[in-house]
C-alpha cells in the first residue's frame, strides 16, 4: 500500500507509482466504467463514472485513487490515504467524497472544452489494484444555417446563381447535404469548407452553383454526426420574369448512343426571334441529376468547358438557334441526362440522354482439361470477352443449335474505365464429337460476338503397357492351365496303374489256390483206387 509523506506534491509521485503498478500488478480489484463514450456538450459539466467493490471493513485511509489521461499519462485528479489531493487539471475536476466509501470513484469534469476529448483512466488501489478507461466525446450543436445568394437581384431563368449555406460554432466537423424542392440530392457543383476557431469549434460554409429555372427551392442540411442533430435552412428563388414559353427548346426523344473514346453531339435547338443577337443569349448545359455545370455561353461569349475541357459548342451556328454540345472522347462515366437551358428574353429548357456503349471482343475459348480427352469425360469450357459496355448477355448452344442453360456460370467485372470483362463457364460431359458455341451480345448496340469449339474425343484404346500386361497375364494363365492339366493327367495315370496292379495280384492268388486243390483230388482218387483194389 502506498503511503503519503512530505508535501502535498506527493500526489504526483503517487500517480507515477500507480502508473508503474499498471505493469506489475494483476488487477485483482475489479474497476467498472461505462463501455460507451460519455458525450458532453461544450461548456457543460460531465461525469466520468468509475466504481469498485469495497471489501468489508474498508477504510478511506486505505484508498489510493488516481485519474489520468490514458494516452499522455497526465495527472488529472488524485485521492490518497483518506485525503483529496485536488485537481491538476485547471481546477475543473472533483470527486464525490460522500460516495467514495461506497465504491464510487467517479470524476466530475466542469466546463467541458473541445480539448478535453479523449480517454481517461481510473486507477484504484486498496490492498489490490485495478484500473479501467472511459472515453469522453465532446460535441457542440451547429447553428441554424444562413443562406445567401450571389447575385441576389434581377434574376432570370437560365441565370447561374451561387447559394452559400453557413453554420457556426459546432463540433465535430459537420456533414452537409443539399437537395432541390423535390428532395433530389444535389452533389455536383458543391464546395464545402470547415475551419476551427480558437476554441476548436467549426464554422461551416458550403457553396452550391445552380442554373435557375422558372422557380427553384434549394435546401441545405448541416448534420452533427455525434449528436445526430440536423440544422435545416432553405431558399426559394423566383426569377423576376417567368417563362412565357416563347423559347421552345428541342432535343431528340431517343437517347444519343456514343461509343467509348469517340465524340458525341448532344443536339439542342431553339427558334431565335427576328433581330436576335448573341449578346442576348444565355446558354447553359448541365447534368440533369446533380446540376453540375458542363458548358456555358453568356452575353455573347463562350465561357468554356467546366467538364474536363472535353466539351464545345458550335459558335458559327448559335445565331441560327443551334445550341448543340459536342462531347469529346466519351467515357463510361459520361452516361446520363444533360439539360440544355436557353435564355434570351424568355426561358426554355429540355433534357437529352446519352447512352454510352463499347463493343465486346471476339470470345476466346479454353478447355480444362485440354488433352487426352475421351467420351464420358467432364470438360470445363470457358468463354471470355473483354472491354465491353454495358453488361453483356451470354448464350450457349450445342452443334445442333439447342440452347444450353444448365451448368453455366457467368461473371462480369468492370475495370477502372468502367468497361466489362466477361467470363462464362460451361461444364459438359463429352460425347464422341461435340461443338459448343458461345455468343456475347451487347444489348445497346445489338451486336453479337461469337466463339465456338469442336471437341473430338479419342476412342477407347489400350496403351502399349496395358497390352503387354494383358499378353503376360494370358501366357501365365495358359501355362497354369497346362500345368494343371499335366498334374491331373499324372494323377489319373497313377491311379490307373495302381488299379491294374491290384487286378493282377488278385489273378495270381486265384491260380495258386487252384494248384493246391489239384493234389488233393489226386490223393483222394488214389485212396479211392486203393479201396477199390482192396
UniProtKB/Swiss-Prot annotation:
Provide a GO CC annotation, any one: external side of plasma membrane
Question: Where in the chain are disulfide-linked cysteines found?
Answer: 50-122, 165-220, 268-340, 383-438
Q: What SUPFAM superfamilies would the database entry show?
A: Immunoglobulin (SSF48726)
Q: Per UniProt, which keywords does this protein have? A: Disulfide bond, Glycoprotein, Immunoglobulin domain, Membrane, Phosphoprotein, Repeat, Signal, Transmembrane, Transmembrane helix
GO MF terms here are: signaling receptor binding
Instruction: State which ranges are Cytoplasmic (membrane side).
Output: 488-534
Report the main location listed first in the record.
Answer: membrane
Which residues are exposed on the Extracellular face of the membrane? 29-466
Q: Give its localization.
A: Membrane
Q: How does it sit in the membrane?
A: Single-pass type I membrane protein
- The region called Disordered is annotated at 498-534
Q: Is Signal given among the entry's keywords?
A: yes
Q: Give the induction note.
A: By bacterial lipopolysaccharides (LPS) in monocytes and by ionomycin in T and B-lymphocytes. Up-regulated in cells mediating rejection of human transplants.
Kindly give the CDD domains that the UniProt entry links to this protein.
Ig, IgV_B7-H3
Residues annotated as signal peptide: 1-28
The family line of this record is: Belongs to the immunoglobulin superfamily. BTN/MOG family.
Q: How does it assemble?
A: Interacts with TREML2 and this interaction enhances T-cell activation.
Name of the protein this chain belongs to:
CD276 antigen
Quote the gene name from the UniProt entry.
CD276
Amino acid at each position: 500500500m502506498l503511503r503519503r509523506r512530505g508535501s502535498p506534491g506527493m500526489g504526483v509521485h503517487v500517480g507515477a507509482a500507480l502508473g508503474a503498478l499498471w505493469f506489475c500488478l494483476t488487477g485483482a480489484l475489479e474497476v467498472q466504467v461505462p463501455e460507451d463514450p460519455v458525450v458532453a456538450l461544450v461548456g457543460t459539466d460531465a461525469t466520468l463514472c468509475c466504481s469498485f467493490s469495497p471489501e468489508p471493513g474498508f477504510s478511506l485511509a486505505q484508498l489510493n485513487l488516481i485519474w489520468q489521461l490514458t494516452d499522455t499519462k497526465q495527472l488529472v485528479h488524485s485521492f490518497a490515504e483518506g485525503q483529496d489531493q485536488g485537481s491538476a487539471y485547471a481546477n475543473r475536476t472533483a470527486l464525490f467524497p460522500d460516495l467514495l466509501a461506497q465504491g464510487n470513484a467517479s470524476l466530475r469534469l466542469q466546463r467541458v472544452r473541445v480539448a478535453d476529448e479523449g480517454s481517461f483512466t481510473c486507477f484504484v488501489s486498496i490492498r489490490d489494484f485495478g484500473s479501467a478507461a472511459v472515453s469522453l466525446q465532446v460535441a457542440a450543436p451547429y447553428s441554424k444555417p444562413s443562406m445567401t445568394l450571389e447575385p441576389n437581384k434581377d434574376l432570370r431563368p437560365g441565370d447561374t446563381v451561387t447559394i452559400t449555406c453557413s453554420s457556426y460554432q459546432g463540433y465535430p466537423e459537420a456533414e452537409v447535404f443539399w437537395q432541390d424542392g423535390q428532395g433530389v440530392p444535389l452533389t455536383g457543383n458543391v464546395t464545402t469548407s470547415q475551419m476551427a476557431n480558437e476554441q476548436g469549434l467549426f464554422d461551416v460554409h458550403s457553396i452550391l452553383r445552380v442554373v435557375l429555372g422558372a422557380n427553384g427551392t434549394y435546401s441545405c442540411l448541416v448534420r452533427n454526426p455525434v449528436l445526430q442533430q440536423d440544422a435545416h435552412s432553405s431558399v426559394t428563388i423566383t426569377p423576376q420574369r417567368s417563362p412565357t414559353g416563347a423559347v421552345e427548346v428541342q432535343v431528340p426523344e431517343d437517347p444519343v448512343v456514343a461509343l467509348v473514346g469517340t465524340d458525341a453531339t448532344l443536339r439542342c435547338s431553339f427558334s431565335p426571334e427576328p433581330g436576335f443577337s448573341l449578346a442576348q443569349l444565355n446558354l447553359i448545359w448541365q447534368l440533369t441529376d446533380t446540376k453540375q455545370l458542363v458548358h456555358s455561353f453568356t452575353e455573347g461569349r463562350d465561357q468554356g468547358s467546366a467538364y474536363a475541357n472535353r466539351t464545345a459548342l458550335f459558335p458559327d451556328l448559335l445565331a441560327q438557334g443551334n445550341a448543340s454540345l459536342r462531347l469529346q472522347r466519351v467515357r463510361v462515366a459520361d452516361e446520363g441526362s444533360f439539360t440544355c437551358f436557353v435564355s434570351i428574353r424568355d426561358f426554355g429548357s429540355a433534357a437529352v440522354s446519352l447512352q454510352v456503349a463499347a463493343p465486346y471482343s471476339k470470345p476466346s475459348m479454353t478447355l480444362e482439361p485440354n488433352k487426352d480427352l475421351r467420351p464420358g469425360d467432364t470438360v470445363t469450357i470457358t468463354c471470355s470477352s473483354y472491354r465491353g459496355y454495358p453488361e453483356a448477355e451470354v448464350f450457349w448452344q450445342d452443334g445442333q443449335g439447342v440452347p444450353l442453360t444448365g451448368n453455366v456460370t457467368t461473371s462480369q467485372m468492370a475495370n477502372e474505365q468502367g468497361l466489362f470483362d466477361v467470363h462464362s463457364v460451361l461444364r459438359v460431359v463429352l460425347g464422341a464429337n461435340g461443338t459448343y458455341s458461345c455468343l456475347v451480345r451487347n444489348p445497346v448496340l445489338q451486336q453479337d460476338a461469337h466463339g465456338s469449339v469442336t471437341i473430338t474425343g479419342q476412342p477407347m484404346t489400350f496403351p502399349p503397357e496395358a497390352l503387354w500386361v494383358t499378353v503376360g497375364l494370358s501366357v501365365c494363365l495358359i501355362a497354369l492351365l497346362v500345368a494343371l492339366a499335366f498334374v491331373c493327367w499324372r494323377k489319373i495315370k497313377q491311379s490307373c496303374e495302381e488299379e491294374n496292379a491290384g487286378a493282377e495280384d488278385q489273378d495270381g492268388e486265384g491260380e495258386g489256390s487252384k494248384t493246391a486243390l489239384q493234389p488233393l483230388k489226386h490223393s483222394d482218387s488214389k485212396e479211392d483206387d486203393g479201396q477199390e483194389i482192396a
